[in-house]
């Protein structure tokens, strides 16, 4: 109904043909897709500016939008969301320069498919990094889909924390399990909630459907500890 009345609509990553709706022209759709597809605070900010100028057609007090920038992938990261590291060596060099690295301290790797560290919504990740560092550990947060197992092998962690949404290493699940067995280390899988703790605890169901299977059932195949 809104589209019929002329309201610009674009449903990104539609789940089925019935809700695959777009009333934008191809150039505008491509621009919006570039911002969303590389979700980070800079791109979201510029998407809002783009919408205001090119879709809402505002003319006064307009700040032109910058081009979308590609989000980092297959990298290690830390508390500064503007920094990322392509190699473990570069990451450890950074930790040493910051006076954070501890020689011979336990190594904790953090991986996950549900938490994007570059999206601007990462308070839970940052608090975990700081807490583990304050406990005397070296923390290795990894943002990677294709190279996750490669990073883990190079890091050689004493434990893995997996913010699960599926298997720890998609496409290499059996190899990942064998690697865990060989190293004989635990994999912890804290639950990521899309609501407040109070709302979750008061909900009799707690989790449901695909979210439950991807966060609890499937990770158990990797030996996840909750």
Locations of the language-model features?
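An N-terminal assembly and electron-transfer interface module characteristic of large anaerobic redox
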Residues: 1-226
